Curated annotation (Swiss-Prot):
Lineage: Bacteria, Pseudomonadati, Pseudomonadota, Gammaproteobacteria, Vibrionales
GO cellular component, as recorded: plasma membrane
GO biological process, one term: sodium ion transport
Protein name listed in UniProt: Multidrug resistance protein NorM
Family: Belongs to the multi antimicrobial extrusion (MATE) (TC 2.A.66.1) family.
Location(s), subcellular: Cell inner membrane
Transmembrane segments: 11-31, 53-73, 93-113, 126-146, 159-179, 193-213, 242-262, 276-296, 315-335, 349-369, 391-411, 417-437
Keyword check for Metal-binding: no
Biological role: Multidrug efflux pump that functions as a Na(+)/drug antiporter.
GO terms, molecular function: antiporter activity; xenobiotic transmembrane transporter activity
Keyword terms: Antiport, Cell inner membrane, Cell membrane, Ion transport, Membrane, Sodium, Sodium transport, Transmembrane, Transmembrane helix, Transport
Length: 456
């Protein structure tokens, strides 16, 4: 008999290291924001605008490679471990291929910024950050390939350890480049980009060493045999990962486009938005980590053809995610001004950020449901459904509602950033409903249908 308590415990055992690793990685953004804000509100705003371009671009690549997690988990669960190195090596190849267009986009993003009506000094600092962080792209994606390999084998601790190494390195490197220590010039927000590039190369090499020395990972024989690159294998991995990448891109770019749209409203509003979005990203790590753990559990169980276990794991994930999000939403509402104070002492930024954090708290339950349900669907390899539903929710519902409320007087007087955050509530709630309904539909189908879907 399956036991809900046991399954919840196993999910949390997988999710907690993923959470710690994700919080460590996202905390790098927190550190960047705080240390850039220590120079000026303009530097903080530059990090915000640059992140609104850098994050969607790099997370598209990460989304492609996250598809390795259910692939490795199913091969592991079905006893076909000898096929894992072939898949992961083609993941490396895909990471290097996709790095090229991402780097080109980031390096030439100045053309996009030139079209934006932003202060000249803000534009200069934003472009400087992007030109520095472009060198992080291949390292980030190669690191993600190794992390997906380890997590597919239910080893989530390595990502946690390496994440903390990155965070611990990011703080002194920011101090050196942002404030100009040890003979380096004071670079302000641009220094955050330099530090980020160095940190991700450090994380990649640290993860590579871990894979080479860890006994369990060594048994997988990742580098025992080098397979001849097969374009069909790379294309298959791309096709499987593209819906995940696109859905991640649509969610992150929703917030990125908002940052770009409100950038002409001034540094105070942009900085307030950055505070709210950065803290929301930290909170989002809780359900996101649970979603990753759930994709591992569901993928492994489907590899064993344990359909009941996959269903129970999905239920446990959704329940735990909802409980956690209720708790974080309440705490965010109660302590929203204290949270803003962690980022800046600018009174105007604190007031506006507190208002946006209240709106962020409203959608935390919806955000948890949609990301956990998406994790379960990744375990079933139902990637296309995630892509379609998130596109509709974020771009056909959330962003139009946000723009209408924030920038026009069609319904009410322009609400500025508040209108966009109300649009976020609409978009994420729609995504939660559609993805949860899709998961329920799959689990109501025949055993043969579910197994066939997981093997495609």
């Amino acid at each position: 008999m399956h036991n809900y308590r046991r399954e919840t415990r196993q999910l949390l055992t997988l999710a907690i290291p993923v959470l710690i690793a994700s919080v460590a990685q996202t905390s790098m953004g927190f550190v960047d924001t705080v240390m850039a804000g220590g120079v000026s509100a303009t530097d903080m705003a530059a990090v915000s605008v640059a992140s609104s371009i850098w994050l969607p671009a790099i997370l598209f690549g990460v989304g492609l490679l996250i598809a390795l997690v259910p692939i490795v988990a199913q091969l592991n669960g079905s006893g076909k471990k000898d096929k894992i190195p072939f898949e992961v090596q083609h993941g490396f190849l895909l990471a290097l291929i996709i790095s090229v267009p991402i780097m080109a986009i980031l390096y030439n993003a100045g053309m996009l910024i030139d079209y934006m009506d932003v202060e000249p000094i803000l534009a200069e600092k934003t472009i400087g950050y992007l030109h520095a962080v472009v060198y992080a792209v291949p390292a980030f994606l190669l690191f993600q390939t190794l992390r997906s390999f380890a997590e597919g084998l239910s080893l989530t601790v390595p990502g946690m350890v390496i994440g903390f190494i990155g965070l611990m390195a990011n703080i002194p490197l920011n101090w050196i480049f942002v404030y100009g220590k040890f003979g380096f010039p004071e670079m302000g927000g641009v220094g955050c980009g330099v530090a980020t590039a160095i940190v991700y190369w450090l994380m990649f090499f640290s993860m590579l060493v871990y894979v080479l020395v860890n006994k369990r990972l060594k048994r997988a024989g990742l580098f025992d045999v080098w397979y001849k690159p097969q374009p069909k294998a790379v294309l298959r991995l791309f096709k499987l990962g593209f819906p995940v990448a696109a859905s991640m891109f649509f969610e992150v770019s929703l917030f990125a486009v908002i940052a770009l749209m409100i950038s002409p409203l001034g540094s105070i509003i942009v900085a307030s938005h950055q505070v709210a979005i950065n803290f929301s990203s930290l909170v989002f790590m809780l359900p996101m980590s649970l979603g990753i753990a759930l994709s591992i559990r569901v993928g492994h169980m489907l590899g064993e053809q344990d359909l009941v276990g996959a269903k129970i794991a999905s239920h446990c994930g959704l329940i735990v995610g909802l409980i956690m999000s209720l708790m974080t939403a309440i705490l965010t509402i109660i302590y929203r001004e204290e949270i803003a104070l962690l980022y800046t002492d600018n009174a105007d930024v604190i007031v506006l950020a507190g208002q946006l954090l209240f709106l962020a708290a409203v959608y935390q339950c919806s955000d948890a449901i949609q990301v956990v349900a998406a994790g379960a669907l990744r375990g079933y390899k139902d990637m296309r459904a995630i892509f379609i539903r998130t596109f509709i929710a974020y771009w056909m519902l959330g962003l139009p509602v946000g723009y209408i409320l924030g920038m026009t007087d069609w319904i009410v007087e322009p609400m500025g950033p508040h209108g966009f955050w109300i649009g976020n509530i609409v978009g994420l709630s729609a995504a939660a409903i559609m993805l949860a309904m899709r998961l329920r539909w799959i689990q109501c189908q025949s055993d043969e249908f579910q197994i066939a879907m997981s093997l495609k």
